[in-house]
Amino acid sequence: MVSKLWKNYDATSAYDGYFTEDNKLRKHATIISSILERHGKKKLQEIEKNCQSTISSRGINFRVYAANNRAEEKKWPLDIIPRIIPKTQWNKVSKGLKQRVTALNLFIDDVYNQKKIFKDNVIPKEIIFKSPYYVKECEGFSPKYKAWSNISGVDLIRNKSGEYLVLEDNLRVPSGVSYMLENRMVMRDVFPELFTRYKVAEIHQYTNKLYNCMVECIPKKKANPHMVVLTPGIYLSLIHI
């Protein structure tokens, strides 16, 4: 039976993370549904207001550019009602993403070195060599572990049957990682009940893992390596001040 909170909700137009096509609540959404129902519209509006206030006070913005190249800063949008991915689903997606990024790194390494992909006629070489992003100076070079892409931003979508599909791969230093970390901190502050009722996967070790990844990719081992992250700072389309 669908509660009053959802009685006018239509979940048939596309895949819905909370409801099946026949408007039955999915198992992993029962807890969040009861939380939302208990709080009611007024309380949820208070949480939303608190969320926006926290975002403003923390200076979480993003920059958009108009047709005249004039930049405008906007507040970062954050939905207080989360997308819930069950652990079994995420484990499968995570495994697939690791496999995909490994394949992409091997592809890049092959393009700059053995070029088997052209010899086997998998892809026309003109597509690669005419690309403005092809760096001829990298020919014959292979980074440690063949890790050309240290950070990969893979955009995922779900089709109507719930299958995960890749919309695009962002390998050229994708932005947005700090937003992920800030989203989590803001949500813990404004909606802590979600984290007591669900066993949410932790992400606070991300920066340490990124550092360790960069250290591992240094060609020669050093006790205290110096690493530099190049960034245009506030001139990025996404900024976090």
Predicted regions span which residues?
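Preference for protein termini
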Residues: M1-I239
